């Protein structure tokens, strides 16, 4: 009898042992995740998207490519020192003549974000440094398919700093979106059905598409520097304010994938992988400081392809892996 009573008491006690709350919210997914995030905080809103974890990972890269900068990369740091920067800044209005800054591209089902972030930054900075005289739309595919192991592993991911070093040494040609203009437009079609297979890294072609009048070698655009930006918000702001958008990498969780609007701050959901993007400015919304960022998941994601992420606390590592470069003009 005593044994039975003791067993019953143990069972009752175990039933009231609290679970680890953080571990529980990290495993939330789908609509349950959206409901939790939208009720647990008011900084940003999420919406449910019918997609598998595997499909979400198609757009991301191996986390090692989004890690904080190594000592070797930190040794290249360049810092712009300014007395002050404005409370709000948007590269789209500061350099309104540069159409590329406003452009949202679509990497489709390939972890080519590192190449997109680099191509977008190169496009913007070439325009900025020439005061609008040159407005190339740089080809992510030229980096993705031709940089090879020098940059990383194609659709599995790559190092943003290596993409900029390739720009310096080998040059990069122009190329728009799928079936678009330029020498080498992106060869992977956007996923519109919601059920698309993972894409393979395209093969390197050192020739322009049929009908393009400029030869591949003549279409190259070059950089003169590739460097890291110090890991602090003030240095990143000064770099953008002085020279234009920068490329950054960070860790992605499922609640980011379901972002719809507001200032993102990781709240719940599992870790999915690394991602690279382009930071174009900053501001404050309802008292929350943010970075203004261009994603490469098409215009139907987030705030018409853009998003805001909390600024100043190295949210998801976004302030630990910022790179930039200067165009040869």
UniProtKB/Swiss-Prot annotation:
Keyword Repressor: no
Disulphide bridges, residue numbers: 98-127, 110-155, 146-204, 147-151, 183-208, 191-196
Pfam families, per the entry: Peptidase_C1 (PF00112)
Enzyme class: hydrolase
GO MF entry, a single one: cysteine-type endopeptidase activity
Ranges in a coiled coil: none
Domain of life: Eukaryota
UniProt-listed CDD domains: Peptidase_C1A_CathepsinB (cd02620)
Statement: the UniProt record of this protein carries the keyword Metal-binding: no
SUPFAM superfamilies: Cysteine proteinases
Keywords: Disulfide bond, Hydrolase, Protease, Signal, Thiol protease, Zymogen
Active site as annotated: 113, 275, 295
Expression sites by tissue: Larvae exhibit strong expression in gut cells and weak expression in hypodermal cells. Adults exhibit the reverse: strong expression in hypodermal cells and weaker expression in gut cells.
EC number of the protein: 3.4.22.-
Propeptide: 16-84
Alphabetized InterPro entries for the sequence: Papain-like_cys_pep_sf (IPR038765), Pept_asp_AS (IPR025661), Pept_cys_AS (IPR000169), Pept_his_AS (IPR025660), Peptidase_C1A (IPR013128), Peptidase_C1A_C (IPR000668)
Cellular component GO terms held in the UniProt record: extracellular space; lysosome
Gene Ontology terms: biological process: proteolysis involved in protein catabolic process
Induction comment from the UniProt entry of this chain: Activated by a GATA-like transcription factor.
Family: Belongs to the peptidase C1 family.
Function: Thiol protease. Has a role as a digestive enzyme.
Entry protein name: Gut-specific cysteine proteinase
Native organism taxonomy: Eukaryota, Metazoa, Ecdysozoa, Nematoda, Chromadorea
